Amino acid sequence: DRECERALVENADAVSVFGSDVTVAAMAERLGDRPLFELGHGVSVAYCGAGSLERRRLDATLRSLALDICAYDQRGCLSPQLIYVQRSPLLGANEFAERLAQALGSMGATLPRGSLPLALGAEQAQWRGVAEVEGALIRGDGYAVAVRPPEPVRWSPAYRNVTVAPVRGIDEVVSCMEPIGLALKCVGADPGSVEELGQRLGRKPGLRAYACPLGTMQTPALDAPADGRPVWEGLLRPSREV
């Protein structure tokens, strides 16, 4: 409704737009010179360092990942679709995927997946079929875990379809994330990796994602950055003292 849209923004000093890239571009064209804060299409990933694969930490790692994946059925921009797992003699990528599948199955008993939209049924079938050809796929009731190389990235249709990709470590992870660019919103990481990963992200001008602990990806702090900027940027102005 263009009339409602004009009434909403005509007296605004700045406008924040959440939506698809097409929606954001259309609003940018219609708003002219008015300051616009664009929050378009976004994706998120997770990273598990070797320390999180140790026997005493593995269960907590898997529970946290399962929660991040199951919350909102991966439909949000903070939902992890791809999990980078550091290669380790402690646990191979295929075994990690099997353990994650078990965790997703357990989580589904208390947090069941919503109904899969008919429009996504074919997309899910195609994603799973390609995953079986490329590497390995573990299917369950309402979820699937693929194991494949980290590049090129294949995004899932959401709804608890997730990829596990083995990597050498943080250096390779950051290299793999760079092509995702500004669409990358959040990187969940194990406690032993989150600080370093956050620092590395901050040094990459082509990335604006922030790092947070696994298990908290879907519950960001009120002041969590949006596309690398403070959430209040452009929306506040200093008051003049009387």
List each model region and its residues.
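Conserved NAD(P)+-binding/catalytic subdomain of aldehyde/semialdehyde dehydrogenases
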Residues: 1-87, 218-242
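NAD(P)-dependent aldehyde/semialdehyde dehydrogenase
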Residues: 72-185, 195-206, 211-240
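Conserved residues at the C-terminal ends of beta-strands
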Residues: 18, 190, 214
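Soluble or luminal CAZymes and related metallo-dependent hydrolases
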Residues: 19, 57, 61, 92, ...
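Periplasmic-binding protein-like
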Residues: 15-16, 186-188
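Generic structural signal for short, solvent-exposed loop/turn connectors between secondary structure elements
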Residues: 1-2, 31-34, 141, 171, ...
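Short, polar loop motifs at secondary-structure junctions
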Residues: 19-23, 150-151, 192-194
